[in-house]
Amino acid sequence: MLRLHLNLCVKVWISGFSLLTFSIYGIFAHAADIKPFADIHVHFNWDQKEIISAQQIVAKIKKQNVAITVVSGTPSALALELHAADPKRIIPFFSPYITAASRKNWYLDKNVLLQAEQGLATKQYAGIGELHLWAGMPPRTDNPVFQGLLDLAEKYHVPFLIHTEAADQRFFLPICQSRPQIRFLWAHAGGTLAADQVKPVLKQCNNVWVELSARDPWRYNTLVDDNNNLLPGWLALCNEYPDRVMTGTDPVWSVRKGQRWDAADDGWDHFEQLLEFHRSWLAQLPPNVEEKIRFSNAKRFLFAEN
């Protein structure tokens, strides 16, 4: 069978953002022809399930040869629903948002710890997260529910996907330093932080890995320049810490607005676009570094066999 591969560069205007260059990668290629990808950060939330099913999501990731996918759900159990649709590819993490309304008050609900322990003890979940902490907003880092989740990560030896929003790395540093036994996956590498702010965390906390989801031009926009070239600081960081960087799509729209009650989240409609963005900047790295960040780092981090 004839297989047509395209690797063209086009310039496009997208949603009012600046002119960007993208590669159209393998539009007509079969999934087996595309390099395997580990998407370390996706969601299956109640406001996504309204417009896309678990089976439709699995079809999307298979088509793009995403071999490993870490999912958290709101409510938490939706991660298990997506996992059930493809247990080989989907790795569920326990989200502290156990109901559709838990995002704002999870840290006041002791049921979070009960459900987390039950899910980890029975090996339903392979990790904890995504959990959000905002500097200057509740909860404080000494909150009993937050600390209890950290205790469970230590007890069951599972990774912890943590999202922090702060002006610099000093908000997260005490957390990773106080829990050296926990393997932290730092969501979005701190979001708005520059590479030179992220590097001290990697240097001082060898239990931290970073993932670069949502650092695309439509959300945090802090990874590449207007021509889609990887910024020098990130290029240097990836080359200096090639074993501790991963990436993912985080198909939530928009990542900074949170969930809405008046409209469904169509983030999965952007999945292919987000994935292509990450493949494009990864292609700028040395081949051995590209392969680690694209796939094998996640495989080792999660103890996945395939």
Predicted feature descriptions by range:
Residues M1-V10:
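N-terminal secretory signal peptides that target proteins for export/translocation
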